[in-house]
Amino acid sequence: MKEILNKQAAINFDELIEVLRRLRAPDGCPWDREQTSESLVPYLLEETYEIIEAIEDGDIKTLKEELGDLTLHILFQAELAREAGQFEIADSIKHISEKLIRRHPHVFDAQNGNQDSDLNMSWEKAKQKEKKRENLLDGVPKKLPALNRARRIQEKAANV
């Protein structure tokens, strides 16, 4: 069953990319063609907040729809990068898969499996090493809303 679901997800994913490319084509939708990474940021944020609201409300139907909307915006950003010759969505997907494996040695590394008693600290150490950050706070996005930023700083400080 898992393999069938993965195949269907891949088919649906490819279809969505083709729909997006058709919308961006010269004979596609004028609105979609004129969008830039920057012009889409407000919509990206809005979709993210709509997902949060659906989760907090326990509204599964809306969550399903909003996850689709956010997926569109992620693919839209990747399509803009592809059009500019910067990278392909496959590069982003490969990168996140590799990163998850690196940051979960307790799951994927048979020699070191389940050796880390503090998984959060292990994650942060791996992240700091990969990103070559000066300190743990370097990775807290400056654009986060103030309360979210304060929470992330507190979480990171608690691991020191």
Regions found by a protein language model. Name each.
Residues 1-66, 72-160:
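Flexible "arm" and connector segments at domain edges
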